[in-house]
Amino acid sequence: MDLQQQPLFRQKALVAGQWCDADNAEKTPIFNPATQELIGYVPNMGRAETERAIEAAYASWEMWKTKTAKERSALLKKWYDLILLNLDVLAEILTTEQGKPFNEAKGEIIYAASFIEWFAEEAKRIYGDIIPSPYPDARIVVNKQPIGVVAAITPWNFPAAMITRKVAPALAAGCPCIVKPAPETPFTALALADLAIQAGIPAEIMSVVTGDAAQIGDAIFASDHVRKFTFTGSTPIGKLLLEKSAKTLKKVSLELGGNAPFIVFDDADIEAAVEGALIAKFRNAGQTCVCVNRFLVQSGVYEKFIQVFKAKIESLKIGNGLEAGSEIGPLINAQAVAKVQSHIEDALSKNGRLITGGQVHATGELFFEPTLIADANTEMMVATQETFGPLAAIFKFDTEQQAIQMANDTEFGLAAYCYTRDLGRAWRMSEQLEYGMVGINKGLISNEVAPFGGIKHSGLGREGSKYGIEDYLEIKYTLFGGL
């Protein structure tokens, strides 16, 4: 389809309830990573436009928070329905600007919508407490109230789901939002906002501001009207934004980098482990925060796992995400390709064994062959740095304690995976792995009903699940005396 003819393909930002260009009329070109072709333009906005979005959100907060939970829930459900009705259009926009295969893009849109459905239901379950009073003439009541205006900065690797996972709980709780999408993937965000307005959500409640990251960020962090900040991205940037948030003491949620281990024990079902490894490593061409960075395989099945994994990797189809059957799309930009290449070169210089892949693919300069390197060691960059690309590095271990030590030997703590048929070992690994999320005999663990988030340098807070709405609420205690 011709995106230019699609009503959901918006080339204006949504600020203070209006679709508009930047004050200075500047525009930023957006390119398709698969073809390098120009897709379109978005406004290059800055501080002034962001301040208007914040003021509009703050002014509309009273109106939004005083709607009943049932009213907010109904609007969110309409938004959910509209997203699913426009599934193919949204998926094509997403694939065109981000690169992932069309079927993966459809899966992401469905996943994104699931958070809206979930939090539409959670809006009606924001409960408080009545606490037994220590005083005979007093009663203690605890209730929860929306925190206020929320600002969200979202990444390019999941340009739909990372927005709805933040915006849906905010809206459900009664909070207006300002979204700053990644510069590489703004069109998905703008399309989602269009559908939110069609669903009846007031336009001033959800601004989408595109443009200069520094200026937009400065406006957000300087404003006392923005009470909550949420970010998904790299750990270094997350730390910087946390520091900036401290000046106005915002409540902060961060979903940051990872260095996920994927542990395969001798007693594992190898075929199942390889299937799990494929999705945990090569989904979105390895560009996911929960993507496996280190495969830890026990010595008894080490070579068998390598050979089965190699055969599966070599069967993956690389191509433009809009081509039928494509399984591996492009990396997002040349810097991403260079990082993968540097990790491969470093590993091979330190006695790594190249099993398959290792080169830029003939399809185009941003396409990279799924790569498997065996005999990895802790001196390699891949042992400590998140590759964020289609490189699978395999480390060998002998004992369970050694696997735990190797897995936990990182500053990160987002996701970990483990394959074993020993129930006792599965429980021990779940408890001893220092990660916010652990997948036992499963390579795809993300869903809307479970809490998503990490520990250590991988972030603060949880998204999704019944816990995900708490970051958008304040707890208020009231004592009624003289009774």
Curated annotation (Swiss-Prot):
It comes from the Bacteria. InterPro entries: Ald_DH/histidinol_DH, Ald_DH_C, Ald_DH_CS_CYS, Ald_DH_CS_GLU, Ald_DH_N, Aldehyde_DH_dom, Aldehyde_DH_Superfamily, Succ_semiAld_DH. The active site is at E255 (proton acceptor), C289 (nucleophile). One of its GO terms (cellular component) is cytosol. Pfam families: Aldedh (PF00171). Belongs to the aldehyde dehydrogenase family. This is Succinate semialdehyde dehydrogenase. The lineage of its organism: Bacteria, Pseudomonadati, Pseudomonadota, Gammaproteobacteria, Moraxellales.
